[in-house]
């Protein structure tokens, strides 16, 4: 695994991995984080030196809020969130000048820097529900726009980009899970037991 070589370059660093990483990668990481828990977990790590993987945009967002830490970033990223650009922001704000811009920290800095709010999907949804504003441009996976419109019918929500669709997220449906549990379809994924045990450690530490 290439990352083992990278880790050897930073032997005194605590390795923080985003939850959306492979099981194999989790086996050599110290702790997992979600976008909503990343800042607090990094703050609570005793070690000043942090190697944050794999999303450099999420990592930069964390680093900005925890300046007391020495955070090294790798050049990974979410292929869905990085599709959105400053041009998309300009276009959306021109179409909806009264709307607040709420974006996920996995977006490019050129997008995040223009936002009225940056946060996890849960954070975005909570902010929109509690806000007195009536219009919002949403810079994350487009299904969140639909969830918000259903939850807040008195407000208007617009996708920052109609291209912000995560096809990987949509590969597995509730029906697939149901069929798999029944044994009539779907696909059961089985992990090597050694990998499972090692990967579980950094999840438990979270």
Show where each model-derived region lies.
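Short, small-residue-biased leader/transition segments that mark boundaries at the very start
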Residues: 1-2
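Acidic (Asp/Glu)-rich catalytic clusters
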Residues: 6-10
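Short active-site oxyanion
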Residues: 11-14, 47-50, 97-100, 131-136
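General beta-strand structural signal in soluble alpha/beta enzymes
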Residues: 15-19, 24-27, 31-35, 41, ...
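Short, well-ordered, mixed-charge alpha-helical segments that flank or form enzyme active sites
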Residues: 22-27, 39-42, 58-61, 79-82, ...
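Internal active-site segments that recognize and position negatively charged phosphoryl groups
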Residues: 40-64, 90-97
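Redox- and metal-dependent alpha/beta enzyme cores, enriched for Fe-S-associated oxidoreductases
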Residues: 61-66, 73-117, 121-133, 144-152, ...
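C-terminal functional extensions of proteins
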Residues: 122-123, 131-133, 140-206
């Amino acid at each position: 695994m290439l990352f083992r070589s990278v880790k050897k370059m930073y032997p005194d660093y605590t390795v923080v991995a985003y939850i959306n990483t492979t099981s194999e990668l989790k086996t050599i990481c110290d702790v997992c984080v979600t976008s909503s828990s990343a800042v607090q977990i990094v703050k609570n790590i005793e070690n000043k030196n942090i190697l944050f993987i794999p999303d450099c945009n999420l990592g930069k967002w964390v680093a900005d809020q925890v300046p007391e830490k020495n955070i090294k970033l790798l050049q990974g990223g979410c292929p869905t969130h990085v599709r959105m650009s400053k041009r998309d922001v300009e276009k959306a704000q021109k179409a909806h000048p009264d709307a607040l811009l709420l974006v996920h920290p996995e977006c490019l800095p050129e997008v995040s820097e223009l936002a009225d709010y940056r946060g996890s999907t849960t954070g975005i949804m909570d902010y929109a529900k509690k806000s007195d504003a009536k219009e919002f441009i949403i810079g994350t996976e487009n299904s969140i726009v639909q969830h918000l419109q259903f939850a807040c019918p008195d407000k208007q929500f617009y996708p920052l980009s109609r291209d912000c669709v995560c096809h990987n997220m949509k590969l597995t449906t509730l029906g697939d899970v149901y069929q798999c549990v029944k044994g009539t379809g779907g696909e059961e994924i089985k992990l090597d037991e050694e990998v499972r045990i090692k990967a579980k450690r950094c999840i438990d530490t979270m």
